[in-house]
Amino acid sequence: DQPRSRGLGDVYKRQALPYALFDPAISGASEKDQYNGRIVFDGVVESARTALANGIPVGLGNDVGCPYVTQYDFWRELCYFHKYCGVSNQFALHTATLRNARLAGVGDVTGSIEAGKSADFIVTRKNPLDDLAALRQLELVVCRGRAVHKPAPKRNKTVDALLDPYLV
């Protein structure tokens, strides 16, 4: 267990993506910013792949305070993890739930649906095992046993339109 390695870099992949891949006219990145963003982006992807290949746990996260990161789109992290690191949808879901809980030291409380654990889960319209983008359309969110039916977060259509092409 390497406490300093917990939550390895997926958040940096997300923060670097606009600088690395967006048209500079959209991101406002200079040529140097774009070059550096690409180095960071590629480095984080390679680090995550190497960690996975060597049995080192990788967690998923995002940083809502950063440009192009919203409070409602953590599901994108799973899609990017699948696309850029080559993991299965099932492994991406496992990483975002039980693995993250274990890395955070709360795997005995949450992260999976088991007797005695907090009732924290979502219900989607479609099966995320088939397509992780199904996580975008929530029917139900349950947190500590409290249900929110048909949650309707205020979406930033501009950010969604800019990021959606990088899902496929």
Can you say where each PLM-predicted feature lies in the sequence?
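Single conserved hydrophobic/aromatic residue that forms the stacking wall/gate
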Residues: 1-12
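Short peripheral tails and domain-boundary helices/loops at the edges of structured domains
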Residues: 141-155
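Active-site gating loops and adjacent loop-to-helix segments of metal-dependent hydrolytic enzymes
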Residues: 10-41
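His/Asp/Glu-enriched, well-ordered alpha-helical/loop segment
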Residues: 29-33, 40-127, 147
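Small/polar (Gly/Ser/Thr/Ala-rich) solvent-exposed segments
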Residues: 130
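Glycine- and charge-enriched low-complexity intrinsically disordered segments
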Residues: 155-168
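Short, compositionally biased
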Residues: 134-142
